[in-house]
């Protein structure tokens, strides 16, 4: 059960990241795609480290 929840949560975060990066790429087509998300351009960018820490804390 724990593994299923972790897999679903990871897939959800991956989809959020995919759509977030797509929206940012459309907003700034000249940006370097290998540079990663730009927190200044997108103040609501997903903080993956904080999410990973929360998942670790919740799932033990």
Swiss-Prot record:
Disulfide bonds: none annotated. It is found in: Secreted; Target cell membrane. Residues 1-27 form the signal peptide. AXPX repeats lie at residues 27-30, 31-34, 35-38, 41-44. It holds the Pfam family Mastoparan. Residues 28-45 form a propeptide. The keyword Secreted applies. Keywords: Amidation, G-protein coupled receptor impairing toxin, Mast cell degranulation, Membrane, Repeat, Secreted, Signal, Target cell membrane, Target membrane, Toxin. The modification Leucine amide is found at residue 59. One of its GO terms (molecular function) is toxin activity. Mast cell degranulating peptide. Its mast cell degranulation activity may be related to the activation of G-protein coupled receptors in mast cells as well as interaction with other proteins located in cell endosomal membranes in the mast cells. Has a membranolytic activity on human glioblastoma multiforme cells (brain tumor cells) that leads to cell necrosis. Belongs to the MCD family. Mastoparan subfamily. This is Mastoparan.
């Amino acid at each position: 059960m724990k593994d299923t929840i972790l897999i679903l949560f990871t897939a959800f975060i991956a989809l959020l990241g995919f759509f977030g990066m797509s929206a940012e790429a459309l907003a700034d087509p000249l940006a370097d795609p290998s540079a990663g998300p730009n927190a200044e351009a997108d103040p609501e960018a997903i903080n993956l480290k904080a999410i990973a820490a929360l998942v670790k804390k919740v799932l033990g």
